[in-house]
Amino acid sequence: MARATARPWFYSSELASVYDFPPGDGAGQTVAIIEFGGGYFPNDLKQFCQYAGVAVPKVDTISLHNAPTNKKDGAEDEVMLDIEVVAGVCPKAKIAVYFSKFTEQGWIDAIDAAVHDAVRQPSVVSISWGWAEDDSWSTGAIDAINESLKDAALLGVTVCVASGDDGSDDGIGDGHAHCDFPASSPYVLAVGGTSLRVENGKPVEKTWKDGDGLRKDGGGATGGGVSTHFARPQWQKVSVKSVNPGSIQGRVIPDVAADASASTGYFTVVDGQAGAIGGTSAAAPLWAALIARVNAKLPSGKRVGYLAPMLYQKVSKKTIGATSCRDITTGDNISAAIGGYRAKKGFDAVTGWGVPIGSKLAAAIAGQV
């Protein structure tokens, strides 16, 4: 997550228009959001919805491990960003926010609680949290959390995860390139970031990288690269090589992207103050809101489900990702000494297949589920 210091900014509803989301308000859907700090503040959401001109959605907060749901510890920026992005696009959807502790068991319980919630029954989950997979995570923790994400995929629940905001370095600073987990899990839709302007009514977009790509230096960049933990899934037939010497042929992230630059950020209200925030942690809930709209249009009993593999399937010689996303071909996420990754024609490790063309994605999904 990164704060914008200047305009332009967008309401999430405006981005839904830029990205040609199918019409709708998310009625009948529940979007789950997983948080590990901060809190939900109804007055902020009410004020946001007044600015955005949308109805105030119903929000449920669920505490796990006695985690507070209304704490002001700095992470409320993240919580309110996630909720407000979804609210702007799907004001008639229910939003369920699961608060837990940032521990291995806390992660597992939060994902399990959302995926197996028989009362709220979310069809899509948004996660804006993570850390470099080969830094503070243990192998056991990654594998255990990944099993919970696998359960989500098997149950047809789409999990959208932010790919990180510090470029190829991922905030580690050891000279090597890193991937964020759980974005690197093969069972999630990993969401990267772009920098978006609208000129003469048309989007102009490139890979998100502000400054040197590191938040500690006042910049930021989309996370993305090649996993050192997860082998490349059979369904991910792409030609991307790790910049780390001797690395495995791992899972490549992100799968897709959306606006994330702090300088072209998302309008939010936090602690009573209106402003703009960016980061892939805004792009992930935007994709979750898109999926909620798509789910609302599908026949009863059908939903998007495990989306990532579908994007790599070929239909009439082109992948669904290529036909359902607008390709981003400029920019890079280089922030590590070893290097990073560049956008190119087709799939790449900075914006994946690109940003959504929502109506085309909805049509493609309808033909597959």
Regions found by a protein language model. Give the residues of each.
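Extended ligand-binding clefts on enzyme/binding-domain cores
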Residues: 208-221
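Detector for glycine-centered tight turns/loop "hinges" at secondary-structure junctions
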Residues: 201, 272-274, 331, 346
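Substrate-binding/charge-relay-adjacent region of secreted/lumenal peptidase catalytic domains
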Residues: 1-193, 222-223, 227-279, 284, ...
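Short acidic, Gly/Pro-enriched loop/turn segments at secondary-structure junctions
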Residues: 197-204
